[in-house]
Regions:
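Short alpha-helical DNA-recognition segment
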Residues: 46-66
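Short amphipathic alpha-helical elements of helix-turn-helix/winged-helix folds
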Residues: 27, 42-43, 85
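Residue-level detection of the helix-turn-helix DNA-binding "recognition helix"
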Residues: 69-70
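Amphipathic alpha-helical interface surfaces
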Residues: 21, 36-40, 49, 60, ...
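Generic, well-ordered alpha-helical segments
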Residues: 28, 32-36, 45-46, 56, ...
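DNA major-groove recognition helix of helix-turn-helix/homeodomain DNA-binding modules
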Residues: 75-91
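N-terminal flexible/basic segments that precede or flank functional cores
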Residues: 1-39
Length: 91
């Protein structure tokens, strides 16, 4: 019998690739703000974690956690900083 593979593990491996991450975020964006923020959290985790993203984006780690939380309301500047740090762009 084949061993089960966790979905989260497969997703994380998939999202480590910038091109795949961009496609994933585009699909998430089309579903609405809550889904987009969850997608962005997924990509951040897959590409090194929140601490790394905050450092590269020039943002405070705790603040970034709050902004990207389920109740978060990140500014456009923060979103742009994170996306730029991940080498992604809004179109």
């Amino acid at each position: 019998m084949k061993a089960a593979v966790k979905f989260e593990s497969v997703l994380k491996d998939h999202l480590a690739d910038a091109e795949q991450a961009a496609k994933y975020l585009t699909a998430c964006y089309e579903e609405g703000p809550e889904v987009f923020l969850q997608g962005l959290r997924d990509v951040v985790e897959a590409q090194g974690g929140m601490s790394r993203a905050a450092r590269l984006a020039g943002l405070n780690r705790e603040s970034l956690y709050r902004q990207l939380s389920r109740r978060g309301n990140p500014s456009l500047a923060s979103l742009n900083a994170v996306l730029t740090a991940l080498r992604l762009k809004l179109r």
